[in-house]
A protein has these predicted regions:
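Contiguous, well-folded functional domains in the mature portion of proteins
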Residues: 2-148
Length: 148
């Protein structure tokens, strides 16, 4: 996918995190990219929350708030901090697949699910050094977005 945004933003309202500031990295996947999504950290899935919505072009910023999406709150094993991963459905096929359950332990790079074609993943994190840059192509399970 392609890093389309790295910015400071409040957390998702759907997880009652609107009063917490995070760094958000957005990764847009076009129809030619692999759409398998992998966990950005080793930790435990604390919460999964589905939100129905529209099917706008996932490269648009407003897709984060308006499109169908699935939220994962993952408690990082190493730091104890929460990392939020959001699968955002896109314009074309419009299907989010979740392959994990609440309470499940994950290792960094484990498969979480997939989004079918023309979609996006947003990752919210705190207290990390951002390694990725806007415009950079990244590969799930291989490219580092941020580090301790």
């Amino acid at each position: 996918g392609l890093i389309t945004d790295i910015s400071e933003r409040t957390g998702p309202v759907e997880l009652q995190l609107e009063n917490t500031t995070y760094t958000k990295a957005s990764i847009f996947m076009n129809v030619f990219n692999c759409h398998v999504n992998r966990t950005p950290t080793t930790g435990t899935v604390e919460e999964i929350s589905y939100k129905p919505g529209k099917f706008l072009n996932a490269s648009l910023d407003k897709a984060s708030d308006e499109n169908e999406r699935n939220y994962y709150k993952i408690k990082c094993l190493k730091s104890g901090e929460e990392i939020i991963m959001v699968q955002i459905a896109g314009l074309i096929v419009r299907r989010i697949v979740c392959e994990v359950e609440q309470g499940q332990s994950l290792k960094q790079g484990d498969r979480v699910g997939m989004i079918r074609f023309g979609s996006r993943v947003d990752i919210f994190f705190k207290n990390k050094k951002v390694l990725a840059k806007i415009g950079q192509n990244v590969v799930a399970g291989e490219s580092l977005i941020a580090s301790e």
